[in-house]
Amino acid sequence: MITKLDKKNFESFISSKGQTIAEFSGAWCQPCQVIKPIIEEIANENPSLQFGEVDVDESYEIAAQYGVKSIPTFLIFQDGELLRMTSQIGSKVHLTKVLTER
């Protein structure tokens, strides 16, 4: 399951225990739409990870706060601490590795 994130729930989401992944995207972003089903598959195959999606048009303040300059961009957190930020996309195998490595 992918949680829709905005300024009301973003901080509590990333502060959750365990690994959380916030994807920054936009409805108009073609690469974001292409990888959406892949992200859903990865989320379903990795139930210990929590996935969330931030629409940069609706929540531009969050994107600015974290320095998101392009989309899709993924921020990976562990227990509320930012581990890494990446805009790497590619095959499902590559994206799974990038998003799930600790």
Q: For the regions a protein language model found, what residue spans apply to each?
A:
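Short active-site neighborhood of thiol/selenol oxidoreductases, capturing the structured segment around
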Residues: 15-27
